[in-house]
Curated annotation (Swiss-Prot):
HAMAP family: FloA. NCBIfam families: PRK13665.1 (NF010186). It comes from the Bacteria. InterPro entries: FloA (IPR022853). This is Flotillin-like protein FloA 2. Keywords: Cell membrane, Membrane, Transmembrane, Transmembrane helix. It is found in: Cell membrane; Membrane raft. The gene is floA2. Its main location: membrane. Belongs to the flotillin-like FloA family. It is a single-pass membrane protein.
Length: 362
């Protein structure tokens, strides 16, 4: 194998003792140069496609930027494509730079979604959205593209939402009739309130509260059935979209049904409660009457005992009267005759002798 001319001349001019060292150094140098060429070729082939795309589209992303993204662990393909989309769409925001895209990517944002949202806002011509606002919305956890689309094309929210435990909003008019309502709320995203503003759940809760209040203030449920638009107007006047991420465009009553007669049910429950109270009061009075009757029977028994005690003293009194001469034998028989006449008259008059009355002791 023929050696190169320069290496041959160098070897011929050097002493024979130094030839092995020079050969080793040349080989090492050749390997280093070869490795460098391989690395350069690898880098060139890896980033040439992205670089040529950026050059042809006017995105102005240099090789140095591409290599730096790799060392910073940034997805170069996502950054280049996002920058190309922004350039082709004519986004002229001065804050929309390669460094800003890298920073948003490293912060955990969705770069391509932000660029798509900016392009959609620019095409709509009615939405003012800057790159800073779009990245802030994206980092706040909101879908910035969906928000822009909702701002352009209003979104319909069911109230109550589909799949909820209660299929309708129940409210009672002043006449006591229950109405079951389902509404549809058309909202448009408010990009200025999207960060920190309330979400769909708040809109649903506020609209439900407004519908219940509007029905509750109606004097007659028939008026609500005849003109459901009364509910929508009453709810829209309250500005329920304040401090929310949406702007309410319209509230439409999708369905309204008549429920139970809550007023009659409440009256029946009240009547039942009044009946229970009256029954309890009557039971109390009956118990008091029974107690009073028992007390009277006790008084009667006490009086009868006193009568029996007094009757037991009569024979002793008569004996004492006989001994003292105050009562003679003829007087006693005369008294017995009068008592017998009295008993006979009672018998003739139909009055039986009271068995509880003790007989007089002779």
């Amino acid at each position: 194998m023929r050696r190169p001319m320069i290496a041959s001349l160098l070897l011929d001019t050097l002493p024979l003792a130094q030839m092995p060292k020079v050969t080793t150094a040349l080989l090492i140098g050749a390997l280093v140069i070869f490795a460098g060429i391989v690395v350069v070729l690898f880098i060139f082939t890896s980033y040439f496609g992205l670089w040529i795309q950026s050059v042809l589209t006017g995105s102005k992303i240099s090789f140095g930027n591409l290599i730096g993204m790799t060392f910073r662990k940034v997805n170069t393909r996502a950054i280049v494509r996002s920058k190309i989309m922004a350039t082709q769409a004519g986004l002229d925001d001065p804050e929309l730079t390669v460094g800003a895209l890298e920073a948003h990517y490293l912060a955990g944002g969705n770069v391509q979604q932000v660029i798509r949202a900016l392009i959609a806002a620019k095409k709509a011509k009615t939405i003012s959205l800057t790159f800073r606002e779009a990245t802030a919305i994206d980092l706040a956890g909101r879908d910035v593209l969906e928000s822009v689309q909702t701002s352009v094309y209003p979104k319909v929210i069911d109230c109550p939402p589909r799949g909820s435990a209660k299929p309708s909003l129940d409210a009672v008019a002043k006449d006591g009739i229950q109405l079951k309502v389902r509404a549809r709320v058309t909202v448009r995203a408010n990009l200025q309130q999207l960060i920190g503003g309330a979400t769909e759940e708040t809109i649903i809760a506020r609209v439900g509260e407004g519908i219940v209040s509007a029905i509750g203030s109606a004097d007659d449920h028939k008026a609500v059935l005849e003109n459901p638009d009364v509910i929508s107007k009453a709810v829209l006047v309250k500005k329920l979209d304040s401090q929310t991420a949406f702007e309410i465009v319209s509230i439409d009553i999708a369905d309204i049904d008549v429920g139970a007669n809550i007023g009659a049910r409440l009256q029946a429950d009240q009547a039942e409660a009044d009946t229970a109270v009256a029954r309890a009061n009557a039971e109390g009075r009956r118990a008091a009457a029974v107690a009073e009757e028992q007390e009277m029977q006790a008084e009667i028994a006490k009086s009868q005992a006193q009568v029996v005690e007094a009757q037991s003293d009569v024979p002793r009194a008569m004996a004492e009267a006989f001994r003292s001469g105050k009562l003679l034998v003829m007087d006693y028989y005369r008294l017995q005759n009068v008592s017998a006449d009295t008993e006979m008259r009672r018998a003739l008059a139909g009055h039986s002798h009271d068995p509880d009355t003790p007989e007089e002791t002779h």
